[in-house]
Amino acid sequence: MKLLMLCREPRLYSCQRLKEAAENSGHQMDILDPNRCLLKLSENSPHFELIYQATMEHEPSRLLNYDAVIPRFGSQSTKMGCAVLRHFEAQNIPCLNSATAFLQARDKWQSLQMLMAQGIAIPHSLLAGPEFQAPSTMQYVQSPTILKTLSGAQGIGVILAEKRQSAVSILETLKQADVSVLAQEFIEEANGADLRCFVIGERVVASMQRISQNGEFRANFHRGGLAEKVSLSEAEKTMAVKATKALGLDVAGVDLIRAKRGTLVLEVNASPGLEMIEKTSGIDIALQMIVHLEKKYQALQNVTKTIELRSHK
């Protein structure tokens, strides 16, 4: 297959591993920055065109004939990245996470609503409108409080407010900056640890426990967190797969936290990093992603052939 990966930083570990796994499996892979793409729609054939400008100095070139797409763009490229994904989806080219699913996962409040609608346990959470006063908001959540911007990854945009007044001040400041924030209960008994489950299709293929360090409450790799192998219960594996399905994702990093009342889903990541979890688990996740994409491509080919056969009868 000729594969396309949408990624702004091709030198990142995850992108390099996926390219390596694809090429070792006999595929060709291009890596393109979605922000350097021009999408063209035309009544004339071809109806969907992708034109790419590698640098400011390069002449734009038309790109054709990709068989499947892997999205790996960050939160700052979500809008254009999803527009490129839809361009391929409209041509029945399989994508390893659809644009719709990507957008749902990237909106933290919407994803929590969708998880709750499927009966999946999450921390108590609040989202107040811009005219709802911050002191009144804090009447409905206990301190300490976690405050999260509605988008962001790698622990960025997540704040721990130890006291009620601190939370009020932060909410008021962010409101002035026109930044929407959700408030969430702090799971103190987790002691700065959470679980990352890497889901592909209907299986948890790898997992790890992340542990915060040096007084930092966030356990993310990019915040200095450490990782260790962990055994998940069958209920936790089922929860991770159910959360992935709830958002319509093929591939996801599902973050769980063990609370006194049971395990909860913190959030679902549509473009989870590979480095920390591959090195901790010893599992070749990149290869499993390529294998899953091969199966998705073949399934779509079979459906297309069936439709063509029926149309000729």
Curated annotation (Swiss-Prot):
Gene3D superfamilies: 3.40.50.20, ATP-grasp fold, A domain, ATP-grasp fold, B domain. Residues 112-294 form the ATP-grasp domain. One of its GO terms (cellular component) is cytoplasm. Pfam families: RimK, Rimk_N. Keywords: ATP-binding, Ligase, Magnesium, Manganese, Metal-binding, Nucleotide-binding, Protein biosynthesis. Mn(2+) 1 binds at D255, E267. Mg(2+) 2 binds at E267, N269. The keyword Nucleotide-binding applies. ATP binds at K148, E185, F186, D194, R218, A219, N220. PROSITE patterns: ATP_GRASP. GO terms for biological process: protein modification process; SOS response; translation. Its EC number is 6.3.2.-. Mg(2+) 1 binds at D255, E267. GO terms for molecular function: ATP binding; metal ion binding; ribosomal S6-glutamic acid ligase activity. Its cofactor is Mg(2+); Mn(2+). Belongs to the RimK family. Mn(2+) 2 binds at E267, N269. The gene is rimK. This is Probable alpha-L-glutamate ligase. Binds 2 magnesium or manganese ions per subunit. It comes from the Bacteria.
